[in-house]
UniProtKB/Swiss-Prot annotation:
Membrane-spanning ranges: 27-46, 59-78, 83-100, 114-134, 143-163, 176-196, 204-224, 237-257, 268-288
Entry keyword Cell membrane: yes
Record InterPro entries: YndJ-like
Name of the protein this chain belongs to: Uncharacterized membrane protein YndJ
Keywords assigned by UniProt, alphabetized: Cell membrane, Membrane, Transmembrane, Transmembrane helix
Membrane topology, record value: Multi-pass membrane protein
Subcellular location field: Cell membrane
Major localization class: membrane
A cellular-component GO term for this protein: plasma membrane
């Protein structure tokens, strides 16, 4: 990194000396990002992937950066546009690296997606820089507009998503608001570009939405708990200045829409360019380097099932994945002690709860499904689809009904997890309610229940953390306020894995010597939509379907 700093400083001094006294402020701004801000984000992005191909690309990008940056300077000093092609190709490889990370990552956390999208947008900046240096004619745009577009993609389109991602690594509250803000920030550069090209009205709308997102982003910055006073001051200063400069962008866009000159382009270069560089980007870079925000999943060892469903799941789905050695399991968990952590001591649970999870086949189950009022119209449609798919088939009938269950071994090599077993539950009509693939694992000293539900050409995985509460068992996917831990509900496809806006909690309680009750709550976007009550009875010979 020190080498990059020295090379960048020498290149920038050389550019200023060669161009003086007629130095283009816009050219200086784009070089400022190329020479200082691009290498400045390397610690936030690189050295964070276990994928060998990504690590190989990281090393190449770090080693090749000084050469690519040098050719970018040459392109402006010599006016040989071909030199800018080197920088463009370098940014393209950064984008390919980001796409590889997105493709290979196990969990598509919204904050990490935001960081990587910044690298993808940088490739757009590389293209517009090449277009300017090579004097390409693009639509009706003049050279200055092309250069300013390159500046835009080397600044806000590139760096704001990265800073937003770093904020996502830090905040513990308002996660839903953060997700919406992030998607606006990620999509706004495209909407603004379309507006500038095709529609002044769209441009005003896009800038307005982007401005609202930036102001809400500032709210999160000013309510976030940072580690250091210096980092807090610099990051909040950056956010405050950004609120001012984005307001000037709104004024400029509105003037273009009304065909009235409110601010000239030269004024915008100083306000939106120079001030952003030294009042927004530089403080944020220094502040985030001090904070050193790490990804939530940096130390996670979570694994996901490699088994995906077909068009129909049902009980027959298990034919291809049943264990080759016909392994037999009597419970969902071999030993509840494998889930032990500082928050969970199995010996503090009622013995009957331990018995149920370790000897599940010795219990009969009845269930009662209650959909929240607001969700009932959707539940009717959902029931129709779930019956045909044969998975997560929950009735709209509010009455109690019996569940017939059995446990079968699953081929662990095909699944990718250890000691996997399927818990199959059917109703009195012989319709499959659930086919759930159970496993347990440990990560960072904590045990988790890993439950995979095969879906058509995908799977949904619930990673549940256990807690003891008096003699009751709590299993939940809801993330802790500290954002530590692996718990959550995830959708996995061959394209990758992403968290879902779902959460669930089970509360299991022993009410008699041979009877348990369980309550299963589910939330969508934090709003409860489902409650399932279970009555679980221990008998020596459970009822089987005849």
């Amino acid at each position: 990194m020190k080498r990059n700093g020295i090379v960048s400083a020498l290149c920038f001094i050389g550019f200023l000396a060669a161009e003086a006294p007629d130095i283009s402020v816009a050219e200086a701004l784009v070089l400022l990002s190329i020479l200082f801000f691009v290498p400045g984000i390397f610690p936030f992005v690189f050295r964070q992937s276990p994928v060998r191909a990504a690590q190989f690309m990281e090393n190449g990008l770090i080693q090749c950066y000084p050469v690519a940056a040098f050719f970018a300077v040459l392109a402006l000093v010599t006016e040989v546009g071909g030199f800018a092609l080197i920088w463009w190709m370098y940014t393209v490889f950064n984008a390919l690296y980001a796409i590889l990370r997105l493709w290979e990552t196990k969990i598509h956390r919204i904050e990490e997606t935001s960081v990587l999208f910044g690298l993808i947008y940088l490739a757009g900046g590389g293209f517009w820089f090449f277009a300017y240096a090579a004097h390409l004619q693009i639509m009706q745009f003049g050279p200055l507009i092309i250069l300013l577009t390159a500046v835009h993609f080397h600044y806000s389109a590139f760096l704001i998503p990265i800073f937003n991602g770093l904020l996502g690594r830090t905040i513990r509250k308002h996660r839903m608001l953060y997700s919406w803000i992030t998607w606006v920030i990620l999509l706004s550069p495209l909407l603004i570009a379309l507006g500038i090209t095709y529609s002044k009205t769209l441009d005003v709308i896009a800038v307005s939405i982007y401005m609202a997102a930036i102001y809400l982003h500032a709210f999160l910055v000013f309510t976030a708990a940072f580690r250091t006073k210096t980092g807090t001051f610099l990051i909040r200063l950056s956010s405050a200045v950004l609120m001012i400069t984005i307001a000037f962008s709104m004024i400029y866009s509105f003037g273009v829409f009304r065909q009235e000159v409110t601010l000239t382009i030269n004024q915008m270069i100083w306000i939106h360019g120079f001030v952003n560089a030294f009042g927004v980007i530089l403080p944020a870079l220094i502040g985030w380097r001090i904070e050193d925000a790490k990804p939530f999943d940096a130390d996670s060892v979570k694994t996901f099932s490699r088994i995906y469903g077909k068009r129909k799941i049902g009980e027959e789905f298990l034919a291809n994945i049943q264990a080759e050695n016909n392994a037999r399991y009597s419970g969902l968990v071999d030993d509840m002690g494998s889930l032990r952590s500082k928050d969970f001591s199995p010996e503090k649970l009622a013995p009957l709860i331990l018995s149920f999870y370790e000897q599940t086949i010795e219990y009969n189950i009845k269930a009662k499904v209650t959909w929240s009022t607001w969700f009932r119209p959707l539940a009717i449609i959902y029931e129709w689809f779930s019956r045909r798919i044969g998975q997560i088939h929950l009735s709209t009938n509010p009455d109690w009904y019996r569940m017939y269950s059995k446990i079968k071994g699953v081929h662990s090599k095909k699944d990718g997890r250890e000691r996997v077993r399927a818990w199959i539950r059917t109703n009195e009509k012989n319709e499959t309610i659930f086919t759930a693939l159970y496993s347990v694992y440990r990560s960072n000293g904590e045990g988790y229940m890993n439950i995979s539900l095969p879906l058509p050409f995908s799977s949904m995985t619930g990673i549940l953390k256990p807690y003891h509460h008096q003699e009751k068992l709590v299993l939940t996917s809801r993330r802790r306020k500290s954002r530590a831990g692996d718990e959550g509900i995830y959708l996995q496809t061959r394209a990758g894995t992403c968290p879902l806006p779902l959460s669930e909690t089970f509360l299991i309680e022993a009410v008699h010597d041979n009877k348990l009750t369980a309550v299963h709550h589910m939330w969508l976007f934090g709003i409860k939509f489902l409650t399932v009550h279970y009555s679980i009875t221990h008998i020596n010979q459970p009822i089987e379907r005849t």
